[in-house]
Amino acid sequence: SLLSPDIEKQRILKKVCEDNKIEFIAYSPLSFGILCQDPNYISKTNKSLLRNSIFNGYNKPTIRLRKSIKEIAEKRSVSMAQVAVNWCCYQGAIPLIGLRKQSHVLDISKVLQWDLTKEEYNKLEEASTSCKKLPGNPFTSN
C-alpha cells in the first residue's frame, strides 16, 4: 500500500520472493479505504468506531497523496481505488483487496485493463513519501 510503514523493506522482501519464485501479495492496498477517499472528504461518524478513528487520524496527513491519486483517476476516468491497486500491480504484487459490494468488485476488476505510466507511478511514490504511514501489522513477523 502507498501508506505502508516501510516500503523499502517491502521491496527487499519482494526481491527475495522473486529470487525464490514466490508470489508477493500486497495486503490492504486501499489502506482500509483511506486511499479511496476524496481529498476534500470531511470525516463523518462511520458505523465502525475503529474505522472512524483511522479515518480521522489519516484524513489530513494524506491529503497530498489522495490529491495525486484523484488527479490520475480523473485523467484516466477510473476510480481512486483502481489507481491505488494499480500502484501495487505496477510493482508485480498480487493485491489482496477486501471488497464488500458487487459494485466494488466490478470497479476493481477494471484494474487489469490499464497500467500506470512511469510518470504516474513516480508521482504517487513522491506523494507517498511525504505523508503519514499506517502502523505496521501486529500479526506479521519482522
Protein language model regions, located:
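Beta/alpha (TIM)-barrel catalytic core signal, keyed to glycine-rich beta->alpha loops juxtaposed to Asp/Glu
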Residues: 1-142
